[in-house]
């Protein structure tokens, strides 16, 4: 029997079982079916009972009065009582009498009334419902002739010409008349073209093709609104625009032929009604829909009607799905006339947002400023690259509205505590009722009313506070910027005072980690400041540099310091060691493997990393080690801030800082100084640096192509480290060692003699600071490791590292420190 039940009727039975569980009964009687009919809320039975002033709360009270609560033990499968089974049989009989091949909520209600002797009938009687009028009311709502049916006649007169279509679709024209659709702004050209195609004699089926989120479905809604406003040619007047849900059409078709029968019925209804325009969103889902075990799919069933003009259909799909599914079937493709829906411009998007403003203000109960709407379109276009206008801009104002409303509607802490207490009181009261302790329940009810009154008083006092603005909260440009920053990680918000201070003193902060190299630190700091203030070119990366110079002078270290200071941590930097890209085929690792090769689905290392983190530093370390083809790939990144990956997606590099390090020219630097290794006057040092820089630039020109070098913002040649700078770096390295050994609860220090020895051994102008690191390892870390392992230094000790007169490194414990003085 249940296979004939509609979805709503099945929901009623499920709700009836839930009601039985709630009351602790191990059976489903007529009274539970009645509660299910009222609780379902949307069916004809619920509407009839609602019109007779029957609500779920009162019905539950009456049922509980008559049958009370059960033991509380309820089986998983709850059986029907004999009377309830009789109601189900009578509902089947009622459906047959009305000529229906399904059992709906209305038939269950008529069966319930016809049975007439169960608890349900007593409940309705107690609620002062005229039981005798229920059947007539149901039949009237069904659109039947009451007299003919009361006498048992099988003649039916359907209220609607298209019942199946209404079951599996939504009437957009009716929704437009009721004001249920969002206004459609612009798109007049596309709507006119759709009307033009619909006016054809045959093949009058437009298909809207465009990227996701450009407003394809909105065009169908715009047509429905124009029909509702009678702003269409006479050929389209009184037409119904109905959107078909293909998923719902396929759902529940258990047996072969059921799907075809549904679709055939819909086509027959459309043909006989002769005033229906069918809208199928995601029209590519027709291909293969319902085609199980050799059955014909929906597309093949629709083809004849589409070609002959019997069926006016508006399809909507994306460019990719159209190419993948519909273009592969030329017979289906020729029946549809494509209408390309392009992405609107920023100005058009702002107009669309102004048109939608009222709907979103009403929903969120606030006001949206003009600046916020303009900012939403501008920021969405500039910073959110993998989606399309106007959808991404609408999402921004929607989420900003939600955020502002939530921030303005938070309860005071006192009210939150009371709310928590109220929930506990309600729970205890319910438990007391179940245990039939009515006196205790009454006490808890009194407490419940008291708490509710207190919460209401707090809410009222909050409203009456004079310092609060009684007007609706306003969504501003800053709120939109906050949402963009949360989505993308790109700071779009206005600069705060603390952030301005941070940017102004950026050089000093970076110099805490990078000794010397003023030119590089200043160039990087300027680029970051330009970008954050919003003065950089919006179509190029923040900046692009080549750091060239001898090894070990801080090229990579500066990039790490920048990532750590400004982007959160060193891990936030995208680092590509170009020595891994020496072969030609490794280019594909950056942008993804081509189709047909292993790893195609995974995407490229570079492109995927930037998609996830669009605001970051990208370090191409040791750039000269890479294969020359890599440089060709970098050309469009440097110039236009974009790169297309193997899947054809455009990746946005406009908010990245590109740094390439190179050792080209290190030999020139080593030889070019002439008197290197000797102390030079400041003028001599500067003239020597200028000469070295020009020599390095010449060598770079020999190695890289001119079009590559010409696209870079700056080529920075790092200086060789002086002895004083090496001494400062030694201090930094020693502090790192002190911090590491402090974790083992050992206090460490070194003497000036040891520092001097460290600098002497670690200073080599040709190799930068790396020999110093080796010297720290050899002279300090090795000595300490031996002392710790031998047990001479233990947790809680203090130690000093010194150098003896013979030049040997020695570690002295705390009690021997006076020997140093």
Curated annotation (Swiss-Prot):
GO molecular function: ATP binding; ATP hydrolysis activity
Repeat 1: region residues: 5-70
Clp R domain sequence ranges: 2-144
Record key words, sorted: ATP-binding, Chaperone, Chloroplast, Nucleotide-binding, Plastid, Repeat
Residues where ATP binds: 210-217, 549-556
Source superkingdom: Eukaryota
Ranges where the record places region Repeat 2: 80-144
Cellular localisation: Plastid, Chloroplast
One Gene Ontology cellular component annotation held by this UniProt entry: chloroplast
InterPro entries, per database record: AAA+_ATPase, ATPase_AAA_core, Clp_ATPase_C, Clp_N_dom_sf, Clp_R_dom, ClpA/B, ClpA/B_CS1, ClpA/B_CS2
Pfam families: AAA (PF00004), AAA_2 (PF07724), AAA_lid_9 (PF17871), Clp_N (PF02861), ClpB_D2-small (PF10431)
Biological process per Gene Ontology, one example term: cellular response to heat
SUPFAM superfamilies found in the cross-reference section: Double Clp-N motif, P-loop containing nucleoside triphosphate hydrolases
PANTHER family: ATP-DEPENDENT CLP PROTEASE (PTHR11638), CHAPERONE PROTEIN CLPC1, CHLOROPLASTIC-LIKE (PTHR11638:SF155)
Function: May interact with a ClpP-like protease involved in degradation of denatured proteins in the chloroplast.
Family membership: Belongs to the ClpA/ClpB family.
Record-given protein name: ATP-dependent Clp protease ATP-binding subunit ClpA homolog
Taxonomic classification: Eukaryota, Rhodophyta, Bangiophyceae, Bangiales, Bangiaceae
């Amino acid at each position: 029997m249940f296979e004939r039940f509609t979805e709503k009727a099945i929901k009623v039975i499920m709700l009836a079982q839930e009601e039985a569980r709630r009351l602790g009964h191990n059976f489903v009687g007529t009274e539970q079916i009645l509660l299910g009919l009222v609780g379902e809320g949307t069916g004809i039975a619920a509407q009839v009972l609602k019109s007779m002033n029957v609500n779920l709360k009162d019905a539950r009270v009456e049922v509980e009065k008559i049958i009370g609560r059960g033991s509380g033990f309820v089986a998983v499968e709850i059986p029907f009582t004999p009377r309830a089974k009789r109601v189900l049989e009578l509902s089947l009989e009622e459906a047959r009498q009305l000529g229906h091949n399904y059992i709906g909520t209305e038939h269950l209600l008529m069966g319930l009334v016809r049975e007439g002797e169960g608890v349900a009938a007593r409940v309705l009687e107690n609620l002062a419902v005229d039981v005798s009028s229920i059947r007539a009311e149901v039949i009237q709502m069904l659109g039947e002739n009451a007299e003919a049916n009361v006498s048992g006649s099988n003649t039916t007169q359907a209220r609607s010409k298209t019942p199946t279509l209404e079951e599996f679709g939504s009437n957009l024209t009716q929704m437009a008349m009721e004001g249920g659709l969002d206004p459609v702004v612009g798109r007049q050209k596309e709507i006119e073209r759709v009307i033009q195609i619909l006016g054809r004699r045959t093949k009058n089926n437009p298909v809207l093709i465009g990227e996701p989120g450009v407003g394809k479905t909105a065009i169908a809604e715009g047509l429905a609104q124009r029909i509702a406003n009678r702003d269409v040619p006479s050929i389209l007047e009184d037409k119904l625009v109905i959107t078909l849900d293909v998923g719902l059409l396929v759902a529940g078709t258990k047996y072969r032929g059921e799907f075809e029968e549904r679709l055939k019925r819909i086509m027959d209804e459309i043909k006989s009604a002769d005033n229906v325009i069918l809208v199928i969103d995601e029209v590519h889902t027709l291909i293969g829909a319902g085609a199980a075990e050799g059955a014909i799919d929906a597309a093949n069933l629709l083809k004849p009607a589409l070609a002959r003009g019997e069926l006016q259909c508006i399809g909507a799909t994306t460019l990719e799905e159209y190419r993948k599914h519909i273009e592969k079937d030329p017979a289906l493709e020729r029946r549809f006339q494509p209408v390309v829906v392009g992405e609107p411009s920023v100005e058009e998007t702002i107009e669309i947002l102004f048109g939608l403003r009222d709907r979103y203000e009403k929903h969120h109960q606030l006001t949206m400023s003009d600046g916020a709407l303009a900012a939403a379109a501008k920021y969405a276009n500039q910073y959110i690259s993998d989606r399309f206008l106007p959808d991404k801009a609408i999402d921004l104002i929607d989420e900003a509205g939600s955020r502002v409303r939530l921030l303005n509607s938070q309860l005071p802490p006192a009210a939150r505590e009371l709310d928590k207490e109220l929930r506990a009181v309600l729970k205890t009261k319910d438990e007391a009722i179940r245990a039939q302790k009515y006196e205790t329940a009454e006490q808890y009810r009194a407490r419940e009313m008291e708490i509710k009154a207190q919460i209401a008083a707090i809410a009222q006092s909050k409203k009456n506070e004079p310092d609060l603005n009684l007007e609706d909260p306003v969504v501003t440009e800053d709120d939109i910027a906050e949402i963009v920053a949360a989505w993308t990680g790109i700071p779009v918000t206005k600069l705060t005072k603390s952030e301005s201070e941070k940017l102004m003193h950026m050089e000093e902060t970076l110099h805490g980690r990078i000794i010397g190299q003023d030119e590089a630190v200043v160039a990087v700091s300027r680029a970051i400041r330009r970008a954050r203030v919003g003065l950089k070119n919006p179509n190029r990366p923040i900046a692009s540099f080549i750091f060239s110079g001898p090894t070990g002078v801080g090229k990579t270290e500066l990039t790490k310091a920048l990532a750590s200071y400004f982007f959160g941590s060193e891990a936030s930097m995208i680092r590509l060691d170009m020595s891994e890209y020496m072969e030609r085929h490794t280019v594909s690792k950056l942008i993804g493997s081509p189709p047909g090769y292993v790893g195609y689905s995974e995407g490229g290392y570079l492109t995927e990393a930037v998609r996830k983190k669009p605001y970051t530093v990208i370090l191409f370390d040791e750039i000269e080690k890479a294969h020359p083809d890599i440089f060709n790939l970098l050309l469009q990144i440097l110039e236009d801030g974009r790169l297309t990956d193997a899947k054809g997606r455009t990746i946005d590099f406009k908010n990245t800082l590109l740094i390439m390090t190179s050792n080209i020219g290190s030999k020139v630097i080593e030889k070019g100084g002439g008197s290197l290794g000797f102390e030079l006057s400041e003028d001599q040092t500067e003239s020597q640096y200028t000469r070295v820089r020009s020599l390095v630039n010449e060598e770079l020109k020999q190695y890289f192509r001119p079009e590559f070098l010409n696209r870079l913002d700056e080529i920075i040649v790092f200086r060789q480290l002086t002895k004083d700078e090496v001494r400062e770096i030694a201090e930094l390295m020693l502090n790192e060692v002190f911090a590491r050994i402090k974790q083992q609860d050992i206090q460490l220090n070194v003497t000036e003699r040891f520092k001097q020895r460290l600098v002497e051994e670690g200073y080599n102008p040709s190799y930068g600071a790396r020999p110093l690191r080796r010297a720290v390892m050899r002279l300090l870390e090795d000595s300490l490791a031996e002392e710790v392992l031998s047990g001479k230094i233990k947790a809680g000790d203090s130690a000093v590292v010194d150098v003896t007169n013979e030049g040997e490194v020695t570690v002295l414990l705390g009690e021997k420190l006076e020997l140093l003085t």
